[in-house]
Regions:
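N-terminal active-site segment of His-dependent metallophosphoesterases
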Residues: 1-77
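Extended active-site neighborhood of metal-dependent phosphoesterases/phosphodiesterases
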Residues: 78-154
Length: 154
């Protein structure tokens, strides 16, 4: 039996904080890095071409492992969801695991944008487990959490 697994990683959808409540020291540093360097390394046009390509393929399961976003902003998650939507139609064929940039800082209102936009592809537990039709087992671990301003770890 043939089984095609597609794995995408480090898409880094990026945007700059629009509202004062989204700014903090860590996001300020991240936005400066984005402006000076990262936006050139992670052009959004590349992500759209990637989605187009994968849309034309005959795949059995799609895994997207973080980082979906650069600064963990809601508008980044919104854009990622909108762009990836053609690939997300069959939820039982998609698994998405967050990365450290997806849990970049503690949201002042206690919201988790990853969960808001992509939890249905991971679940509520720290460990995501799925039995794939080919007999493989897919296990994803969400070890990410907001880290202090001086740390990029999650």
């Amino acid at each position: 039996m043939s089984f095609t697994l597609v794995h995408l990683s480090d898409l880094h959808y990026n945007a700059y904080p629009l509202h004062w409540s989204e700014w903090n020291f860590k996001r300020g540093l991240g936005a400066a890095n984005l402006f000076l360097k990262r936006a050139k390394q992670h052009p959004l046009s590349r992500n759209r071409k990637l989605v187009e390509k994968v849309s034309t393929m005959d795949w059995d399961h799609l895994v997207i492992s973080g980082d979906l976003t650069q600064l963990g902003l809601e508008q980044e998650f919104e854009e990622a969801r909108r762009d990836l939507e053609p690939l997300l139609q069959e939820k039982d064929r998609v698994s998405i695991v967050p990365g450290n940039h997806d849990r970049y800082v503690q949201d002042p209102e206690g919201q988790d944008s990853f969960d808001q936009y992509f939890q249905e592809f991971f679940g509520e537990d720290e460990i995501h487990h799925r039995n794939l039709p080919c007999g493989w087992e897919l296990i994803g671990w969400d070890s990410c959490h907001p880290a202090p301003w001086y740390s990029a770890s999650g």
